[in-house]
A protein has these predicted regions:
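Generic preference for hydrophobic
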Residues: 5, 33, 177, 219-221
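Short solvent-exposed loop/turn micro-motifs enriched in small/polar/acidic residues
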Residues: 54-55, 113-116, 168-170, 185, ...
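ATP/nucleoside-binding phosphotransfer catalytic cores, i.e., glycine-rich phosphate-binding loops
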Residues: 179-181, 186, 211, 221-303
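Short, glycine/serine-rich, charged loops/turns that create anion-binding
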Residues: 10-11, 91, 196-199, 224
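Small-residue-rich beta-alpha loop regions that form the catalytic core of phosphotransfer
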Residues: 2-153
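Short, acidic/polar N-cap/turn motifs at the starts of alpha helices
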Residues: 117-121, 172-174, 189, 207, ...
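A residue-level signal for conserved active-site and pocket-lining positions in enzyme catalytic cores
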Residues: 122, 141, 192, 219, ...
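ATP/pyrophosphate-binding catalytic subdomain of soluble kinases
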Residues: 125, 129-216
Length: 303
């Protein structure tokens, strides 16, 4: 098995990869390094490599957080004999890794000694989401937080500021949602998450029951509610208790689905693993077990 480590080419990320290079020296194995040249380049590189080497067994290692994880996963969809792995080195957030508590995603040796699992991915028009796609209040939070993070604000602080901004600007969203052909009949929504993973925004457990290998999208639709009610329930949403919390009663619509259609007369943003995509019509479906993911060994307990 050949390994290709894909690292972010941004200058501010370079110091964070010293740990990776040291681990590679300590764990000799056949590998190449690829440094991305910009947003979307990891997906392009992986697809081109797979096209040129259709029969080669290779594992693409996404070195970073949710952004590069999404790009590598998007690149290997549809190719045989290709795996991906994740090293959370050099990234800002890694919500997708919350699906695997106890796994050591910072250790090269643990990755090399790991096992593979086939996981689902969500297709959104011609793009993909391996963790969570969301719109309404959530995508406004993400767009504002992304802007702050790019200016050096810590992710947790950025997302909390994003929440404050969205409270003022994005609590009433006229977006139509159809789940497996059935329309959710409410004129306005607060937010909606379509989840393969369990967490979004660094701390919000939007889909506590999600399993990323069951062939289903977890649909959580929150109806419009008063500002006071939303503020009172924010902590429950953060903890993943919104599906059972009394203050969310009659405000949450929860479904499991294979296909979802989202549309509006106006342009709106949908967020795919942190990437913001504008549009007015999104056809969304689950691709079961489309990705072969190498999982690292479980962290050793300290005596």
């Amino acid at each position: 098995m050949k390994y290709i480590y894909i690292i972010n080419g941004r200058a501010d990320k370079a110091p964070k990869y010293k740990e990776l290079f040291e681990q590679l020296k300590q764990n000799p194995h056949p590998y190449d390094l690829y440094t991305t040249m910009g947003e979307g380049d990891a997906t392009r590189y992986v697809r081109v490599y797979c096209d040129l080497h259709p029969n080669e067994e290779v594992c693409f290692v996404a070195c970073g957080g949710d952004g590069i994880i999404n790009e590598v996963a998007s690149g290997i969809v549809g190719f045989q004999d290709k795996q991906m792995a994740i090293l959370f080195i050099g990234g800002s957030t890694a919500d997708f890794l919350e699906c695997y508590p106890g796994r050591d995603f910072r250790d090269v040796k643990a990755m090399l000694e790991g096992t593979t699992q086939s996981v689902d991915i969500i297709k959104v028009n011609d793009s993909y989401s391996i963790n969570v796609c969301n719109f309404g209040f959530d995508s406004t939070v993400a767009a504002h937080a992304n802007s702050l993070i790019s200016n050096g604000v810590e992710p947790h602080k950025a997302f909390r500021r994003g929440v404050a901004y969205a409270l003022l600007t994005s609590r009433f969203n006229r977006i139509r949602v159809e789940v497996d052909g059935q329309r959710i009949r409410h004129r306005l929504l607060l937010l909606c998450t379509l989840a393969n993973g369990v967490q979004v925004g660094s701390e919000f457990r939007c889909a506590p029951y999600a399993k990323n290998d069951d062939g289903l999208i977890e649909v959580c639709y929150l109806r419009v509610m008063s500002l006071l009610r939303f503020l009172l329930t924010m902590n429950a949403y953060r903890k993943g208790e919104h599906l059972t919390h009394k203050f969310f009663k009659r405000k949450v619509i929860y479904r499991q689905a294979r296909e979802v259609v989202v549309s509006s007369k106006d342009l709106f943003d949908i967020c795919l693993d942190g990437e913001i995509i504008p549009g007015s019509l999104f056809n969304i479906k689950i691709l079961p077990k489309a990705i072969s993911l190498r999982l690292p060994t479980i962290k050793q307990q300290q005596p």
